[in-house]
Amino acid sequence: MIRDIEYFDDSKGTNVGATVAALAGLGADRKLVVILGGEGKSQDFSPLAEPVSRYARAVVLIGRDAALVKAAIKAVVGASGVPLFDAGSMQEAVDIAAQQARTGDAVLMSPACASFDMFDNYEHRAQVFCEAVQALAHDTGVLV
């Protein structure tokens, strides 16, 4: 927890269904800033639109297929007032997510995509996310 914001690694959320479940589970109690994107595996991302618009405060998009995810959810999510941000790295994604989150929110990295465009595997993506959160904690003077 950093400044009353929790950070959740769901790097195993490599498909739309898993991410929808994570959004519904964690979003029931608080608003989320969700990090989405990666290697999309030709999935239909449109089922993300409704739960993202319901549970998210903001979305940060990473990876090769970020534009595809954005295109699939933009109309519904944009209409609900949830902003969409692009990030070139996991560190940038975590930094943007931290800026968008408010006290009591959570940052959820549940990408709905495979990791192979930017990382060796989902474990490597999780490691890089955790390192980015630790760097953020260090920069804000918080011990994790």
Where are the regions that the model predicts?
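ATP-dependent carboxylate-amine ligase
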Residues: M1-V144
